[in-house]
Each structure stands twice: as C-alpha cells, then as structure tokens.
Design a protein with these regions (language model features):
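A short beta-loop-alpha structural element at the N-terminal edge
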Residues: 2-16
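Conserved beta-strand in the GNAT
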Residues: 56, 62-71, 77-79, 84
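Conserved acetyl-CoA pyrophosphate-binding loop and the N-cap/start of the following alpha-helix
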Residues: 89, 93-101
Length: 149
C-alpha cells in the first residue's frame, strides 16, 4: 500500500469509498444518521484536498481508501480526522496498513490523536489493537492518543 496526497482526478472514487465505508457502519451498530459530516460530499473532499488534508491509499494502482489528517502548528501532533477503507478490503489488514502509513507519513510527528464513536465497537477495538490509549470520553466519543518513538 502507498499513501499519497489525493489527486483531483480521483476525488469521485475517494468519495464513493468514503460513502461505502461509513455506510457499512450500519452493520456494527450505527444508526442511519451516524456517518461523519460531509462523508459523501464531493465539494468537501475537494476542499480537504486543496487544503492538503486528504490522502489516498493505493494498492497495485487501485485507490482503496483515504485519510483526512491535520498537523498541529507545533508540527509534532497529528490529528486523524478520519480514515476509510473500501468495504471490499475490510478484514484483510488494509486498515492496519493504512494506519501504520498514517503514523509515518509526516516526519517529526511525536503524538497522534483521534476520536471515534462509542457505539462503534469495531473502530474502538481497532485503535486499541494499534496501541492507542483512551484518554477521555464524553457521551458520544472515545478520544485516543498514541505517543510515537
């Protein structure tokens, strides 16, 4: 898998994967209204691409997922806005590969932060498996953090 800055010519594919991935959450406890804001919006994904936050995950020339990432002003903290993998690639290790690439994409990152809905047992287990520690929770989300070496 390669992780690279998203290309405008691939936006429609990236949006389709985002929609399919978040729509598949209905199978792990989501209500129909549980997807993140703008997960199916082409305009929003173009904005994220233009601001340098949208990445595409590629395997053998095929886009299989994406990530929305934000680097703090300190240059040492990365916030994972969201990651998504085509449901066809679920349970094949591709999400794990994507997160490992996210963790090394920006040089100098020492801490990664993210959040995920409490109802989503799949993502909560996934981030714990990757070594993320829950640092806080509220009524809707669990907040995770990982210190990098």
């Amino acid at each position: 898998m390669k992780l690279e800055n998203a290309e405008l010519k691939h936006i429609e594919r990236i949006v389709a994967i985002s929609k399919a991935a978040f729509d598949s959450d209905i199978h792990v406890g989501a209500s129909e209204a549980a997807a993140p804001p703008d997960y199916d919006s082409t305009a929003w994904h173009i904005q994220m691409k233009n601001e340098g936050h949208l990445l595409q995950a590629v395997i053998d020339g095929e886009i299989v997922g994406g990530a929305i990432l934000f680097v703090d002003k300190d240059g040492e903290t990365l916030y994972v806005g969201r990651i998504f993998i085509d449901p066809v690639h679920h349970r094949k290790g591709d999400g794990l590969s994507l997160m490992k690439m996210v963790e090394t994409f920006y040089p100098g990152i020492r801490k990664i932060k993210l959040d995920t809905p409490l109802w989503n047992a799949r993502t909560n287990a996934f981030y714990t498996k990757l070594g993320y520690c829950e640092v806080k929770r509220d009524k809707e989300f669990a907040y995770y953090q990982k210190e990098l070496d």
